[in-house]
């Protein structure tokens, strides 16, 4: 039985080989394989290599673009930070200038008020002095008038030969004693 199986297997195998040999023609198979190998090298040289180089170049180009974009982003961020700090500095400087201007205006206001008060005080003092001077002049004129009137009255009453200078002294002494002026 084993032999029978073996014989039947070998017959089947022969049949399969015969069928296969009908489909496969060895020289055609060799030419086809050789053509495929040649086609592979031609395609590798003419198509795969340029495509591979194109893909590598594209990959490198994309990597460079990404790197440039990252650099540009970093530079933009740096510029943004720089401009923000400059803007903050300018704002602080403007605030400082405004504060200084406000302080100067306040000091100027206080100086003007102080000067106005001093000038008003000086004018008051000058007016008081002027009033005092005019009062003294008026009193002096009144005194002279009173002296003249008193002399006239005394000369009419006395009708003596007294000298005018002595009369004046006498009247002045009388007025001083009375407290007029």
Swiss-Prot record:
Q: How does it sit in the membrane?
A: Single-pass membrane protein
The alphabetical list of record keywords is: ATP synthesis, Cell membrane, CF(0), Hydrogen ion transport, Ion transport, Membrane, Transmembrane, Transmembrane helix, Transport
- InterPro entries cross-referenced by the UniProt entry: ATP_synth_B-like_membr_sf (IPR028987), ATP_synth_b/b'su_bac/chlpt (IPR002146), ATP_synth_F0_bsu_bac (IPR005864), ATP_synthase_B_chain (IPR050059)
Q: How does it assemble?
A: F-type ATPases have 2 components, F(1) - the catalytic core - and F(0) - the membrane proton channel. F(1) has five subunits: alpha(3), beta(3), gamma(1), delta(1), epsilon(1). F(0) has three main subunits: a(1), b(2) and c(10-14). The alpha and beta chains form an alternating ring which encloses part of the gamma chain. F(1) is attached to F(0) by a central stalk formed by the gamma and epsilon chains, while a peripheral stalk is formed by the delta and b chains.
Q: Where, per UniProt, does this protein localize?
A: Cell membrane
According to its UniProt entry, the function of this protein is described as:
F(1)F(0) ATP synthase produces ATP from ADP in the presence of a proton or sodium gradient. F-type ATPases consist of two structural domains, F(1) containing the extramembraneous catalytic core and F(0) containing the membrane proton channel, linked together by a central stalk and a peripheral stalk. During catalysis, ATP synthesis in the catalytic domain of F(1) is coupled via a rotary mechanism of the central stalk subunits to proton translocation. Component of the F(0) channel, it forms part of the peripheral stalk, linking F(1) to F(0).
Which gene is transcribed and translated to give this protein?
atpF
GO terms assigned for molecular function: proton-transporting ATP synthase activity, rotational mechanism; proton-transporting ATPase activity, rotational mechanism
The entry's cellular-component GO terms read: plasma membrane; proton-transporting ATP synthase complex
Tell me which family the UniProt entry assigns to this protein.
Belongs to the ATPase B chain family.
Disulfide bond residue pairs: none
Where does the chain cross the membrane?
Answer: 23-43
Protein name stated in the entry: ATP synthase subunit b
**Species annotation:** Acetivibrio thermocellus (strain ATCC 27405 / DSM 1237 / JCM 9322 / NBRC 103400 / NCIMB 10682 / NRRL B-4536 / VPI 7372)
